[in-house]
Amino acid sequence: MRALLTNDDGIDSPGLHELARQVEAAGFEVVVVAPSFDASGTGASLGHISRERPIHYEKRQIAGLKGDAFALDGPPALCTITSHLGAFGRRPDVVISGPNLGLNTGRSVLHSGTVGAALAAQNFGIKGLAVSLAVSDPWHFDTACQYTVDLLGPLMEAPDRCVLNLN
């Protein structure tokens, strides 16, 4: 199974790096495509794309990850869509977005880039999982990543287009 990992906090987020390593250790083929900037609050937007402003990306390295990683100059939903279209290899079976630095509950999900990436996946029949954290002293990335990996089995058995939001 191929997993696309993205987020809205940007490619350099330590939580994203930890999640990528743990999902890969769980047996998934992992590709990371995340914004090159903090894209918090972008929802499911695609950003501005035109002939004058094409989509740029660069290859990155994530310590301890065998899979590829890319920083894309666009919001998380664009990371999902370009991955679905084959820009970074085979289409993913699941999109995992996060872990976000802060909750995504209630009305805030409408504006969340983390949730927006997972919702963009379901538009193409791909399962999605948005992951967010609330406690920041310290950030408990390891725990959030363990819960994420635990949810992947049931999620992969769920119908296509299933999206979960873990907080």
Residue ranges of model-derived segments:
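Proline-centered loop/turn at the N-terminus of a beta-strand
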Residues: R2, E29, G125-K127, C162
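A cross-family phosphate/adenosyl-ligand binding-site feature
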Residues: A3-T6, S13-G86, R90-R91
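Short beta-strand segments
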Residues: T6, V33-P35, S97-N100, V131-S132, ...
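Alpha-helix C-terminal capping segments
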Residues: S83-G89, G116-K127
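Short, Asp-centered acidic motifs that coordinate Mg2+ and/or phosphate
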Residues: V94
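Glycine/threonine-rich flexible loop motifs
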Residues: L103-S112
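Glycine-rich phosphate/pyrophosphate-binding loops
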Residues: Q122-A144
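Electrostatically charged, flexible surface regions
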Residues: T143-N167
